[in-house]
Amino acid sequence: MRQRFVDSLDFWRYLFERFLADQGPKSAAALTYTALFAVVPIMTLIFVVLSVVPDFQGIGEQIQGFIFRNFVPSSGAVLQDYLRTFIEQARHLTWLGVGVLMVTALLMLMTVEHTFNTIWRVRRPRRGLSSFLLHWAILSLGPLLLGTGFALSTYITSLSLVSDPYALAGARMLLKVMPLLFSTAAFTLLYVAVPNTAVPLRHALLGGLFAAVLFEAAKGLFGLYVALFPTYQLIYGAFAAVPLFLLWMYLSWMIVLLGAELVCNLSASRRWRRNPLPRLLVLLGVLRVFHQSQQSGQAVRQPDLQRAGWALPDSVWDEMLDFLEREQLICRVSDGGWVLCRDLNRYSLESLLSRSPWPLPHLDQLPESLDEPWFPALRSALERLQRERAALFGDSLANWLQPPLSEP
């Protein structure tokens, strides 16, 4: 029980260290700046897409009201009137103007994707058609899914089971938790679809729930702060809603990125422990998988390593690929896998150690046991190396710095 508690503390410590190392606050500020220019275009595109479907007429107003009512603190009510005016004016734009709005929205989505790829250590971002199709799907199918969800919720609310004064308590509770469910679904979809890598659905769901709960808590605390400390109203007067809205957007992006870090690091089984496995041992384990696959004429992919007992995070897998490809030990094949392109019978361990960016581990860094056939020989060699090192360099430092003069 105590070990599990210590592991949990280590995990959250590592998570926040990664968040700061990935410049989460700086990325949240950049996304806030980008989103500031994309709020009106995205809301306008939602109206435009929903207006294409006759059954969704008028749902855009419901979506806008729902967003400001449940996802923005009460201080955003004044700003909502301004945005509604801007959106009404933008809805009368020509198709050329709508195209400009769409480009603005696409730029924000590209910024989000770049930030997520940085968190997931993705080496190859989407390019060309695949990137355009993803962003187009979000901008076109997203409003339709929102409209369908709101039409369904409106229908459920109209049922006597919910709207009747004697409605079931469970039905009323469902309506109360709907914002949390919508937030969880939105965050989960964001974490699954945007990074250019395979994200386990259960990890994305846990991260989505974490971000949604944190989002609701932050909304309540933010509203409480605005009510108890009305400093912004005293300084900015009628314009107080603008800096408050910017601050809220910044906090929201911080939560989104922190949830992304959680999703990314849920698969990092070893990285957050205080005594992680030395990276050189991981490299030898990966090379053994490549060597075995070469004997059977098979290419290696990341799931093959997981089946062999090496569940590497994407960042570690990418580091291994970078080094092995740079040393011309592996090469990529047409189907996306990797194969050895060098005869390991003609490549010594000494050559690997001299070129590896990861140092030879000390004995106290080795695990007590490791299910690898090469591990006992490596431990024995390190023990012998340590004894020889102690014999060679065991003399006092004073004698090394000022050796005795040799007799004539």
From Swiss-Prot:
The chain crosses the membrane at residues 33-53, 92-112, 132-152, 174-194, 209-229, 238-258. It comes from the Bacteria. The keyword Transmembrane applies. Belongs to the UPF0761 family. It is a multi-pass membrane protein. It holds the Pfam family Virul_fac_BrkB. It comes from Azotobacter vinelandii (strain DJ / ATCC BAA-1303). It is found in: Cell inner membrane. This is UPF0761 membrane protein Avin_36810. GO terms for cellular component: plasma membrane.
